[in-house]
UniProtKB/Swiss-Prot annotation:
This is Phosphonates import ATP-binding protein PhnC 2. Keywords: ATP-binding, Cell inner membrane, Cell membrane, Membrane, Nucleotide-binding, Phosphonate transport, Translocase, Transport. The complex is composed of two ATP-binding proteins (PhnC), two transmembrane proteins (PhnE) and a solute-binding protein (PhnD). InterPro entries: AAA+_ATPase (IPR003593), ABC_transporter-like_ATP-bd (IPR003439), ABC_transporter-like_CS (IPR017871), ABC_transpr_PhnC (IPR012693), MetN_ABC_transporter-like (IPR050086), P-loop_NTPase (IPR027417). The gene is phnC2. It is found in: Cell inner membrane. ATP binds at G34, R35, S36, G37, A38, G39, K40, S41. Belongs to the ABC transporter superfamily. Phosphonates importer (TC 3.A.1.9.1) family.
């Protein structure tokens, strides 16, 4: 389904991603972990064609993705949607219009200039917002929403593209623990209910273990771990993060006792 073969990205003499190889045979929820500068974001940007690879290839369903240009690249970016830590919403625009921006590459220049949307798209946008629990916020400006709500708007915008893959670059890094769990539960539901592949860069081990079927660890641009959440032991984590014997997972935990049992089963239930 998705094959990443020896993918490499260099910035001058620095190698940000070094011969990354990943094979995904079916829609899966994958968490990528590693310290800052490990190459996680660069890897996702190459997957989305926001950044070109120095070497290596990306293939999805038999189609070569590496090096796409113009309309072909825009089409791929619709099939492989991306959300970011910063949300990237238009603050003074209402929520539903932000969601509808997910259809921009499918609309004419005239429709884009005058902000014209078909009723069917508007209804679909509201349905997606309702699915994410924020339909009542549709008419509000994006800037009036909390961080967790804004990230769900960004997810809704991605879903408007009807993608096969959702890439999430540190989607909960700027959120409090409660909102972080709401966002991760939403991504897990999208994977389970829609059969979409979700690949998320994550900064906490407990989040990767709880929500992901597969965890990939990166260190200094290289993939040093690729396995199940159960295989992600403290010793393995120490190696991924290059930490000493004093390494503590608790320092990065996002667990909340009150939310210990989410509305959906954890990833372990699907292992």
């Amino acid at each position: 389904m998705l094959t990443i073969d020896k993918l490499t990205k260099r910035f001058g003499e620095k190698t940000a991603v070094d011969a990354a190889t990943i094979r995904v045979e079916k829609p899966t929820m994958i968490g990528i972990i590693g310290r800052s500068g490990a190459g996680k974001s660069t890897l996702l940007r190459m997957l989305n064609c926001l950044s070109s690879a120095s070497e290596g290839t990306i293939t999805f369903e038999g189609e070569e993705i590496t090096g796409l240009r113009g309309a072909a690249r825009r089409n791929w970016q619709s099939r492989c949607a991306m959300i970011f830590q910063q949300f990237n919403l238009v603050p003074r625009m209402d929520v539903v219009s932000n969601v509808l921006h997910g259809t921009l590459n499918k609309r004419s220049t005239f429709a884009t200039m005058f902000n014209l949307y078909p009723q069917s798209d508007i209804h679909r946008a509201i349905e997606i917002l309702d699915r994410l629990g924020i339909a009542e916020q549709a008419a509000k400006r994006a800037e009036a929403l909390s961080g967790g709500q804004q990230q769900r708007v960004a997810i809704a915008r991605a879903l408007m593209q009807n993608p096969k893959i959702i890439l999430a670059d540190e989607p909960i890094a700027s959120l409090d623990p409660m909102n972080a769990q709401v966002v991760m539960q939403a991504l897990r539901r999208i994977h389970e209910e829609d059969g979409r592949m979700v690949i998320a860069n994550l900064h906490t081990l407990d989040t990767a273990r709880r929500y992901c079927d597969r965890v990939i660890g990166m260190r200094d641009g290289r993939i040093v771990f690729d396995g199940t959440p159960a295989q992600l032991t403290t010793g393995v984590a120490r190696d991924i993060y290059g930490a000493g014997a004093g390494f503590s997972e608790a320092a990065t935990s996002t667990e909340i006792d009150a939310l210990d049992k989410p509305d959906i089963p954890t990833a372990k239930a699907y292992a």
